[in-house]
């Protein structure tokens, strides 16, 4: 039975980058990884209404730099920057090192896979039909430049007794092409019937490598020209129609005996 590989992990070091960018010794690695998971869970709950797509954590020497990608940066910053200062103080208390927080805006939230998944789960929690939510998200993504999108929902859809899986796809979604820019997102909706999982794949085109850019070549004239002969040298028969061609009008013919005499008469 075929299973789907995680699109981001499949493309790491090819066209994707890690969400946690730091190095640690074997004794410290587990603790720092657990710290990153706790920070992401905290930010997900704290900034639930800020439409956060992803969080990148970097650890330079004895510092931490957290970049939050959000489609509503004003909600994260707050009035006169009060909310972000409180957020920075809480992160410093949790991580134990000075923390620098950067906010990056997501220009097109309709084509961000994580934001699409979060939007669908919020609609499911408000008892909106899952088919309507999925098709509306697909239409918005294709309208704003996505080349393909696939959405899959699994669980007790519409409150049925037996859980099932339904998915819809529009456009092209190449999952095993490494140069394909596939954005992947996952979210869970906590409904009264149970948890419904939503997965989203968005295809945004191909990544062109440094040497893969198409080169536009000028059209060349492939017709071979015969080099010119010096003046004053002509082959016999040149200048008459068909005289310089094999099998022409005057080639291969022999004058009939007595033809000149008949023409002179």
UniProtKB/Swiss-Prot annotation:
GO MF entry, a single one: structural constituent of ribosome
Pfam families in the record: KH_2, Ribosomal_S3_C
Basic and acidic residues composition-biased segments: 221-239
GO biological process, one term: translation
UniProt xrefs under CDD domains: KH-II_30S_S3
Protein name listed in UniProt: Small ribosomal subunit protein uS3
Chain residue ranges for the region called Disordered: 211-265
Keyword RNA-binding: yes
InterPro entries named among the record's database cross-references: KH_dom, KH_dom-like_a/b, KH_dom_type_2, KH_sf_prok-type, Ribosomal_S3_C_sf, Ribosomal_uS3_bac-typ, Ribosomal_uS3_C, Ribosomal_uS3_CS
Gene3D superfamilies found in the cross-reference section: 3.30.300.20, Ribosomal protein S3, C-terminal domain
Residues in KH type-2 domain copies: 39-107
Assigned keywords, A-Z: Ribonucleoprotein, Ribosomal protein, RNA-binding, rRNA-binding
Subunit (UniProt): Part of the 30S ribosomal subunit. Forms a tight complex with proteins S10 and S14.
GO cellular component terms, A-Z: cytosolic small ribosomal subunit
Family as reported in the entry's similarity comment: Belongs to the universal ribosomal protein uS3 family.
Function statement: Binds the lower part of the 30S subunit head. Binds mRNA in the 70S ribosome, positioning it for translation.
Superkingdom, natural source: Bacteria
Biased composition (Gly residues): 240-251
SMART domains: KH (SM00322)
């Amino acid at each position: 039975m075929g299973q789907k590989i995680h699109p981001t992990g499949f493309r790491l070091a090819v066209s994707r980058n890690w969400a946690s960018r730091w190095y640690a010794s074997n004794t410290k690695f587990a603790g720092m990884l657990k710290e990153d998971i706790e920070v992401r869970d905290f930010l997900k709950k704290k900034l639930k209404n800020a439409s956060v797509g992803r969080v990148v954590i970097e650890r330079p020497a004895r510092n931490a730099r957290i970049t939050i990608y959000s489609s509503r940066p004003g909600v994260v910053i707050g009035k006169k920057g009060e909310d972000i200062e409180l957020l920075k103080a809480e992160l410093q208390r949790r991580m134990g090192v000075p923390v620098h927080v950067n906010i990056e805006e997501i220009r097109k939230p309709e084509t961000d896979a994580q934001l699409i998944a979060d939007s669908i789960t919020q609609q499911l929690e408000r008892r909106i039909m899952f088919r309507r939510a999925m098709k509306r998200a697909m239409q918005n993504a294709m309208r704003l430049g996505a080349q393909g999108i696939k959405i899959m929902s699994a669980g007790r859809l519409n409150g049925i007794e037996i859980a099932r899986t339904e998915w819809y796809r529009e456009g092209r979604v190449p999952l095993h092409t490494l140069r394909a820019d596939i954005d992947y997102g996952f979210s869970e909706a906590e409904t009264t019937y149970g948890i419904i999982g939503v997965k989203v794949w968005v295809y945004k085109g191909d990544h062109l490598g440094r040497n893969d850019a198409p080169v536009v070549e000028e059209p060349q004239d492939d017709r071979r020209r015969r080099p010119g002969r010096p003046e004053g040298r002509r082959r016999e028969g040149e200048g008459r129609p068909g005289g310089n061609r094999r099998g022409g009008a005057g080639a291969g013919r022999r004058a009939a005996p007595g033809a000149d005499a008949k023409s002179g008469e």
